[in-house]
Amino acid sequence: MKWIDLHCDTLSILTGGADTGIKRGRAGLRENNLCVDARRLKEAGAAAQFFACYVNASDFCNGEVRRNGEIWDRAYRKILSMTAYAACAQDERFRIARSAED
């Protein structure tokens, strides 16, 4: 049976975007010691996996940043770094979808 998981925090944890207290250990989207990785998704016959790109914007602020709004730019740059990290793990089974056609 093919299945789709619509939310997974693995990417956020691996890139430090989520403060979970979980030790990263062997870390990577292809294989890790968390709940989801590409190897196990393939073994389970997953049709798709949506990795969350979570950041806590307050982690990027100080008094000056809060006043000039740069907090959102910093948080967005962190999200872009997460998608770049995921792109490094792409192969024939594991790809980033950026549109409905993908």
Describe each model-derived feature in a short phrase.
Residues 1-102:
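N-terminal hydrophobic targeting/anchoring segments and the immediately downstream early-domain regions
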